[in-house]
Amino acid sequence: MTNIRVAIVGYGNLGRSVEKLIAKQPDMDLVGIFSRRATLDTKTPVFDVADVDKHADDVDVLFLCMGSATDIPEQAPKFAQFACTVDTYDNHRDIPRHRQVMNEAATAAGNVALVSTGWDPGMFSINRVYAAAVLAEHQQHTFWGPGLSQGHSDALRRIPGVQKAVQYTLPSEDALEKARRGEAGDLTGKQTHKRQCFVVADAADHERIENDIRTMPDYFVGYEVEVNFIDEATFDSEHTGMPHGGHVITTGDTGGFNHTVEYILKLDRNPDFTASSQIAFGRAAHRMKQQGQSGAFTVLEVAPYLLSPENLDDLIARDV
């Protein structure tokens, strides 16, 4: 069987992780990386992102390793014209619209576009649906962390005077236990998570910066917030990793008997796990096209066996 020919669009943290992990796949060959930059620190062939159409006959799947704020919404439909695509679009509220736009582009080209892969959306999405379907009368809560929030960290770094900063999202242990007991029905996201900030800044700016953090709407207002000012050496030695994870907890009653389904992720490096998920769904996208399908699909619409490099008979014999 011929290997799946894949390429990467974008070369940030996620793109580098995808590149590294494709080398571990038994059924994929990396054709190249499409970038706006002329040169990259890699041995993989680099092509101008404007020339994707010139390589359409050489690529089966494009891994779109771009930002969700503007890049994916604006550019992903164009890429779906030339190959199957897999993205990690994570604006939850806008996923239905994104799926519709990608469906139009992919269907017109006869390709498959898998949208919003990763872990949330992605693996957490699948678990939410499975657990809720099994427990018809249920409470369900998603907790994020402990882990680095890239969006909130970026917000900290935009504050004048901040030299370096990271923000960790921490789930409330009390809220976790309430969720496991089925007693967290009235808790909001702001009550279930804590924002922990580590900031490098001149001492004269500390008071103003802390006030700016605590009063920042959409990011910190309403949350329990902890602000820690540290020196640059401590920051560089202790706060340059990218851990993350979380819990999906579903509790339900089946006529007097209580049940709990808890799905946990503990990730040493967020981009690597997100890339691993994206790659598995890339395999599925290629197989779905081979089966004659086209259009856009979420992770909920993909048969699990399509993700695995192993054949279905072996999976059934071992895992069912």
UniProtKB/Swiss-Prot annotation:
Class in the EC hierarchy, top level: oxidoreductase
Gene3D superfamilies: Dihydrodipicolinate Reductase, domain 2, NAD(P)-binding Rossmann-like Domain
Binding-site list for NADP(+): 11-14, 35-37, 65-68, 88-90, 117-121
Catalytic activity: meso-2,6-diaminopimelate + NADP(+) + H2O = (S)-2-amino-6-oxoheptanedioate + NH4(+) + NADPH + H(+)
pH-linked activity: Optimum pH is about 9.8 for the oxidative deamination of meso-diaminopimelate and 7.9 for the reductive amination of L-2-amino-6-oxopimelate.
UniProt keyword annotation of Amino-acid biosynthesis present: yes
InterPro entries linked to this entry: Diaminopimelate_DH_Ddh, Meso-DAP_DH_C, NAD(P)-bd_dom_sf
SS bond partners: none
Activation and inhibition: The enzyme is also inhibited by L-cysteine, and by p-chloromercuribenzoate, iodoacetic acid and HgCl(2) in vitro.
Residues binding substrate, per UniProt: D90, D120, W144, Q150, G151, T169, R195, H244, N270
UniProt free text on domains: Is composed of three domains: a dinucleotide binding domain, a dimerization domain, and a substrate-binding domain.
Descriptive protein name: Meso-diaminopimelate D-dehydrogenase
Organism: Corynebacterium glutamicum (strain ATCC 13032 / DSM 20300 / JCM 1318 / BCRC 11384 / CCUG 27702 / LMG 3730 / NBRC 12168 / NCIMB 10025 / NRRL B-2784 / 534)
